């Protein structure tokens, strides 16, 4: 093929690629705005959401940073993510994989780690951490399924999985897998409802206290030791 035709072909290929990228960005932006309107009763218009919602700004900037990261333009990707963090108070690593219609409500203090994977139609609230435990290498952060809600202040730590349609209560600390269609509460998080069936009497008010549980265990152990000593005497 002639050099002139090769150049023309490469230009057309680049133009097609650019058009596809721009189309995808606008399509994702429209979906993200629509999901905010659907999930936040305080949202009044698309213009308000676009300019005044820090969660949307963080997601929008992450999608751009992620494109640079996937093209191995790491400095530009990190620069965009740091700008987003300063503007919104939300820190998302540019390598994190985020699905469609992701909504960060309020948003301040949200942290999403490098190897985190988030499905479609996920909602997280302020103070949520999708982080690591410091013990793992490679895949260090959680995988979140579709249609998941994670309440304010919840911590999901390690390379675990949160199943589709699950809900994590505010303040919960999740350290192991949560099955699909489940509700988990407490520290550490415990599944209290699965497939619409309540598993025990726990709720967001009566959250298990790990310190109290440990004290009770130690007291029982002390009583057992006392009995053993008395029997020997």
What does each of the following model-derived ranges do?
Residues 85-192:
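Structural signal for interior beta-strand "rungs" in well-ordered beta-sheet cores
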Residues 1-88, 199-233:
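Terminal amphipathic alpha-helical/low-complexity segments used for targeting or macromolecular assembly
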């Amino acid at each position: 093929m002639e050099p002139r035709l090769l150049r023309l072909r490469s230009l057309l290929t680049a133009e097609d690629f650019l058009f596809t990228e721009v189309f995808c960005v606008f399509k994702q932006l429209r979906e993200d705005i629509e999901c905010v309107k659907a999930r936040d009763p305080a949202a009044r218009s698309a213009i308000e959401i676009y300019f005044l919602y820090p969660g949307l700004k963080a997601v929008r900037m992450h999608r751009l940073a992620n494109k640079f990261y996937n093209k191995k333009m790491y400095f530009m990707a990190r620069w965009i993510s740091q700008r987003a963090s300063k503007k919104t108070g939300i820190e998302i690593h540019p390598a994190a994989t985020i699905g469609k219609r992701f909504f960060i409500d309020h948003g301040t203090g949200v942290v999403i780690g490098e190897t985190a994977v988030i499905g479609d139609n996920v909602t997280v609230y302020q103070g949520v951490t999708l982080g690591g435990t410091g013990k793992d290498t490679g895949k260090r952060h959680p995988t979140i399924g579709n249609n998941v809600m994670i309440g304010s202040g919840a911590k999901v730590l390690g390379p675990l999985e949160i199943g589709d349609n699950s809900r994590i209560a505010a303040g919960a600390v999740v350290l192991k897998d949560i099955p699909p269609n489940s509700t988990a509460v407490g520290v550490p998080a415990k599944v209290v409802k699965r497939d619409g069936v309540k598993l025990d009497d726990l709720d967001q008010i009566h959250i298990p206290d790990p310190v109290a549980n440990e004290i009770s265990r130690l007291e029982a152990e002390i009583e057992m030791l006392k009995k053993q000593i008395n029997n020997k005497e």
